Amino acid sequence: SIQALCRRQHVSLTNVYRVRNGDEYQFDDVNIKIFGGRHTENARGVYLPSEWDDDVESLDSELGWFGSLELQQYLITANDGSSVLIWGGMTTPDQKYRLQNLHPDLAILHLSPKQEPDVFGEMVKFIGPKVVIPHHYDMTKPLFDSNPVLLDRMLSAEQRAKYIVDGKFDEKAFVSAFANAIETWCPTAQMLRIEHHKWYQFGLAYAEEGSKPQQ
């Protein structure tokens, strides 16, 4: 939770905004809207520990819980109208309706093998972004490679059948399943697989009907 994080890191609360679903903050140059999220699903369920683990690296520590019941999503809109959606968590049934018709220029979306690609693709259709950049997916293979027991703990038998090749989690098969789902459900959106340690510049473009976009 934010209180545990601020206490642990000894962060001044002067510039900390504790946000909840439905909040909206207007600043001089940006507007931020908050949408409630979920991070409480895996194959065996998620349960709060009876007591917190003192080891801050543990998933059962107060910090390791990562605010699973407090997860929030953010739509950030600049004064020029350009907008970015930051989304993480799980594709629970409420999410597509919470985020319906936001139409951000850029959607930075959490990919997880615990999600179903078609459910994810449908959510993207409801959101209606121009460009999708996935995040989180690149930590999945290192996590499973370092702790294989999590494959059974976090994934269903069907998910393991799709994404495990020769006993190892296959990141390419995983990401491709979601890219294909986006192409099927929301062909107007483009999913970019960006590389680590590179800068990318995005700009606006226009196009007359039947012509190529002009910068």
Show where each model-derived region lies.
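Active-site neighborhood of phospho(di)ester-bond hydrolases with catalytic His/Asp-centered motifs
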Residues: 1, 18, 85-90, 106-112, ...
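Binuclear metal-ion centers of metallo-dependent hydrolases, dominated by the metallo-beta-lactamase
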Residues: 5-24, 121, 125-215
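Core dinuclear metal-dependent hydrolase active-site scaffold
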Residues: 19-102, 196-215
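A conditional alpha-helix N-cap/helix-loop micro-motif detector
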Residues: 67, 113-114, 171
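A short, acidic, amphipathic alpha-helical segment used as a generic capping/interface helix at domain edges
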Residues: 94, 115-121
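Local beta-strand N-terminus motif with an aromatic residue
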Residues: 103-104, 129
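Glycine-rich nucleotide phosphate-binding loop and flanking beta-alpha elements
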Residues: 114-115, 140
